[in-house]
Amino acid sequence: MLPLKSMTLNEQTDLLHVDAGALWADVIPYLDRYGRSIEVMQSDNNFTVGGSLSVNCHGWQYGRPPIASTVESFHLMTADGTVLRSSRTENKELFSLALGGYGLFGIILDADLHVVRNERLKMEQAVVPLDDAMALFDRKLHERGTPRMFFARLNIAPHRMFDDVLITNFYTEKGDIPKLKSPKLVGLRKLLFRGSVGSEFGKEVRWQAETKLAPVLAGTTFSRNQLLNESSGWFLDHSDATTDILHEYFLPPDMAVPFLKQARTIIRAHHEDLLNVTVREVQTDNDTFLNYADQPMIAFVMFFDQRRTVDADQDMGQMTRELIDVVLHSHGRYYLPYRLHASGDEFLAAYPQAEDFFHLKRKYDPDNLFENEFYLKYARP
């Protein structure tokens, strides 16, 4: 799909027609020339449009549902080779199934996406105790209004795990929009991040750098496109001995802090090397069948370093299931694209609509042309 990456912007309707193989790294500079920006995407630009739609990614654009909410229509090649246009009014069942459908209903060939204006944004940050974080954020909303972008990070130093939260908001600001440039401080950020692997001292140094040094070195004024134009390459593990493991959990806002306190106990008990927790919010997804945001959610993206051994993988699986159990008891859900550690019962508890989803899968693809490990584990065809 990667060669399929053409794109055209309709400036009158703010609709971007883009091939599924285009990377966000291709799309962002293109839109920047027209003063436009992607409405919803994940935090890294080295993903394809088609892949992002297939997992129904969400981002740190505040007050927004996942990316499916920005899709006007797309073309889908189905199991019999037919190419269908799908939207909320045309082949609408396939619209809800293919978005966030993990490739099980066909191949998304292209899409029409709603885009927004590029803007000048001012960063404001605060470090607060975990128990005060939700109240402070609500107070900030009342005082400053709705931010355009938002994320938070948790202190992951073992002796202070989750005790402190770095809240980062981006508000619109008058003035010229900064030109799109290459990301700053990539080498330093990589050194600090990878230097925190297996090191309590490294994690403490990184926290101090993120909370005190980064705003001074990187600045506080950005364009929206600059914030989106970041690759995951700088923080990835290239070792043969270890690998990166991602988790993501979605909690109702009133259960977010209680979940973290229980998660801290579980992670410490398993002695897993937690490198990062990013916090985002996501609004209700009314577009996809297998939706993870069935209500407004707080999302916790956890990033672990794991040794490439059978024992390490088994322990990671056990810890994951324990975390998922806490999520389920908190009326939350977990994100499906990552490792298949969840049990079948946990999967069905998190996604009670899954049996109907798989039934429709077999309706549209009776010969199971489109399969993946997720389908083979949980659908039991």
Predicted regions and their residues:
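Noncatalytic alpha-helical scaffold of FAD-dependent oxidoreductases
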Residues: 1-381
